[in-house]
Swiss-Prot record:
The gene is groEL. Pfam families: Cpn60_TCP1. GO terms for cellular component: cytoplasm. It catalyses: ATP + H2O + a folded polypeptide = ADP + phosphate + an unfolded polypeptide. Signal peptide: none annotated. This is Chaperonin GroEL. Keywords: ATP-binding, Chaperone, Cytoplasm, Isomerase, Nucleotide-binding. Belongs to the chaperonin (HSP60) family.
Length: 544
């Protein structure tokens, strides 16, 4: 296909147009008084959202050059979302500001490479300043609640629920967000290890009202193959009957004949037993069985280690304070495994999370880590309509990511104040030449933009508020929700330092690439062939 090439100002102006179109659509959502954006969907009701990255991902422009500009800023939002989970609108606003002022300087004759070097120097200084302003969150639930509330657009209910979930599952725990059946938003915490396999036969049920099997202080047998013949298990089963304790069997599967024998023995009352299939598949199954074994102090009986089911001894069995099995899930509470072995296993999984490049693998490893270390909480998001539920779910996701980021790197004053407090760090900074110094000035001006946009969205004059906040110190800032100037940290208006840092780093990175662009290549639009002439109009040549 033929290509069309544009150079210099022609190229950059068209790219800038695309940047502005996308950024203007995204930045209306910034701050507590930011507006919603409605997105058309091919099927079903339109989506209403206040999430910057969701808006950005929907935008495709007709002009290929403008679209490339929009895609660059979309990349800023996506990368910020991937790394920090929030701050996508802030990153977009910063990118637009750096590109806008930078482009004017390039047009006036500044060297783009020197500008980029100056921008990078300034960003490093601002990042240092953000780190110095940061306050550790630790286990301060009030601060966690504030972060969640701000990211959920000031929704106190969501803030409280996330703080409650965090308190229960701790730092390593996993919190997932799901749609509720009703209109209430609730949190449900699963203590201990839960995996998505239920009993193989309903005849194992001990509580017929709840249709659950509940065992106190049971033994747990873990086998990685199919149990075909029950005689292999007889020595263990006989000892179970003598001890009076229950047995949970976790195996790849159980043959119908062996299962029938187990059920008959269970119904006659002599044997307290329940069988479930092993969770996961392939290598992940092996890893999960090993996790269960370490948690319960047992051993995985596997032929890979030269073990056979008939050779199983009592000391190979794990145990736990309580086991609950329903038709879908098995939950093991307070496994009696060795604490040091569990810690060592947690360390191994953390190391794997660090090294893996696959998002899917990372998610599964995180789940395994949570099951061993903290537990799993599920936030069920409810709302009167599906449209509202999806919008609320977006906000809960943002709040959750922001809270995790705050626990990692602490919090800084919110409302764009952290950026303004970094300006003094840039005052004495000079570049190696005039253009580098101009790059530093560009960043100094751009980091005022998030506060200016928050104020504009609240219907006030941005320049006036920015000047007043700059005159203050520390966490003094403008609370757009209440329309007062106050200490934002005390008022609970705080942002995660990680989100604030990553938003600026990503914005500056893409803006630097943009300013140093000299040529843009796009597919040439092919002219559609003219439709054939109607043969009945042949005698009309003399008409004017």
């Amino acid at each position: 296909m033929a290509k069309e090439i544009k150079f210099d100002m022609n190229a950059r102006d068209l790219l800038k147009k695309g940047v502005d179109e996308l950024a203007n659509a995204v930045k209306v959502t910034l701050g507590p008084k930011g507006r919603n954006v409605i997105l058309e969907k091919k099927f079903g009701a339109p989506q209403i959202t206040k999430d910057g990255v969701t808006v950005a991902k929907e935008i495709e422009l007709a002009c290929p050059y403008e679209n490339m500009g929009a895609q660059l800023v979309k990349e800023v939002a996506s990368k910020t979302n991937d790394k920090a989970g929030d701050g996508t609108t802030t990153a977009t606003v910063l990118a637009q500001a750096i590109i806008g002022v930078g482009l004017k300087n390039v047009t006036a004759g500044a060297n783009p490479m020197d500008l980029k070097r100056g921008i990078d120097k300034a960003v490093s200084k601002v990042v240092e300043s953000i780190a110095s302003q940061s306050e550790a969150v630790g286990t301060n639930m009030d601060r966690i609640e504030h972060v969640a509330k701000i990211s959920a657009n000031g929704d106190e209910g969501i803030g409280k629920l996330i703080a409650e979930a965090m308190q229960k599952v701790k730092k390593e725990g996993v919190i997932t967000v799901e749609e509720a059946k009703g209109t209430e938003t609730t949190v449900e915490v699963v203590e201990g290890m839960q995996f998505d396999r239920g009993y193989i036969s309903a005849y194992f049920v001990t509580d017929t009202e709840k249709m659950e099997t509940q065992f106190e202080n049971p033994y747990i047998l873990i086998y990685d193959k199919k149990i075909s013949v029950l005689k292999d298990l007889l020595p263990i089963l006989e000892q179970m009957v003598q001890s009076g304790r229950a047995l949970l069997i976790i195996a790849e599967d159980i043959d119908s004949e062996a299962l029938a024998t187990l059920v008959v023995n269970r119904l006659r009352g002599g044997l307290k037993v329940c069988a479930v299939k092993a969770p996961g598949f392939g290598d992940r199954r092996k890893a999960m069985l090993e996790d269960i074994a370490i948690l319960t102090g047992g051993t995985v009986i596997t032929e890979e280690k030269g073990m056979k089911l008939e050779d199983a001894k009592m000391d190979m069995l794990g145990s736990a304070d309580k086991v609950t099995v329903n038709k879908d899930n098995t939950t093991i509470v307070k496994g009696n495994g060795d604490k040091a072995a569990i810690e060592s296993r947690i360390g191994q999984i953390k190391a794997q999370i660090e090294t893996t490049t696959s998002d899917y693998d990372k998610e599964k490893l995180q789940e395994r880590l949570a099951k061993l270390a903290g537990g799993v909480a599920v936030l069920y998001v409810g709302a009167p309509s599906e449209v509202e539920m999806k919008e609320k779910k977006d906000r809960v996701d943002d709040a959750l990511h922001a809270t995790r980021a705050a626990i990692e790197e602490g919090t800084v004053p919110g409302g764009g104040v952290a950026y303004l407090r970094a300006i003094p760090a840039l005052e004495g900074l000079k570049g190696e030449n005039e253009d580098e110094t101009t790059g530093i000035e560009i960043v100094k001006r751009a980091i005022e933009e998030p506060l200016r946009q928050i104020v504009n969205n609240a219907g006030k004059e941005g320049a006036v508020v920015v000047q007043k906040v700059k005159e203050g110190t520390g966490a003094f800032g403008y609370n757009a929700r209440t329309d007062v100037y106050e200490d934002l940290s005390e008022a609970g208006v705080v942002d995660p330092a990680k989100v604030t840092r990553i938003a600026l780093e990503n914005a500056a990175s893409i803006a630097g690439m943009f300013l140093t662009t000299e040529c843009v290549v796009a597919d040439k639009k092919e002219e559609a062939p003219a439709p054939p002439m109607n043969p009945g109009m042949g005698g009309m040549g003399g008409m004017m």
